[in-house]
């Protein structure tokens, strides 16, 4: 099984938490791919972090692997110039370079770093993707405003099953990179994927963007809106433990949080968002 994360040094905590939650629910060997890059304002993830994460994960299965790819040179050649001065975070675009990493073969499950696994997902991972480039869940809010509002086919890109073989055949990611470079868009990487990809829609339990449900497989800690008693924008990430408890009423991942705490040394605790 192949899992992919992307980002800079600021998301290491999210990657580690997500990986721990996956290993709790999947017993087979997993390749965890991490794509990172050095861009102005962003420090790349270090090999030291990847090595430590692999060492911890191998206590659960000694065949788990963590493979770090620094794609700074390739990223610089496709900088999303049209979107660099927007709210867009360029690190989100790193996943669109997976086709340029030869080691990432066949099928890979991409996860945002604020996604935690709650149940086993083998059935989803093994679904037939022969006719599709990507599979995902409709975006909780975007499905009403983008794509086909009747079909709800505008996907949230936080959990995506990627058919890398087909993506390379169709040059999907190359087309998306060019679109992000040349055209100013709202959430450019997600918009480009939705516009250009041949996509398969899957049940919402595989990317639950709302309240926890009994059938939740992946919980995605996205920004949400509350309308009563007053309008409020709510953004809570899984490493914000008190807010996760008090504002979201989510306690289902406390064992993962405690495990994460247990593998940090004192120096890391002092600099870790979880403790600040």
Where are these regions (language model features)?
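Short internal beta-strands
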Residues: 31-38, 136
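GT-A fold catalytic core of metal-dependent nucleotide-sugar glycosyltransferases
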Residues: 72, 91-140, 154, 161-162
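Active-site-proximal specificity loops/subdomain of glycosyltransferases
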Residues: 46-100
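Short, flexible/disordered intra-domain loops and linkers
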Residues: 38-48
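Catalytic core and acceptor-binding pocket of nucleotide-sugar-dependent glycosyltransferases
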Residues: 138-140, 154-234
